[in-house]
Amino acid sequence: MIKEEIWRVPLQRAVAFFRGQEDVMEETTRVFRFRSCRIDLSELKPASMGIWAAKRVKVRMEGDEVDVEELHHRFLLQFLSM
């Protein structure tokens, strides 16, 4: 399964999220592994929203559907519960 999303968080926060997961391994500062899942992070230009410029990162998760969905669920719990 491949899941690509644009997260409205700075690259540093996305990296901190993956580094904070005990069972996620860091290959490079923008590539992580979780079981069968490979995670690639790409920094995007900020989205212009009037006077605000929201920082964004493209997150691409590829691997077994169960692993991709579990990691995505963790992200939702972390960032949507704030």
PLM features: residue spans?
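Short Gly/Thr-rich strand-loop-strand
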Residues: 27-33
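Amphipathic alpha-helical segments
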Residues: 6-24
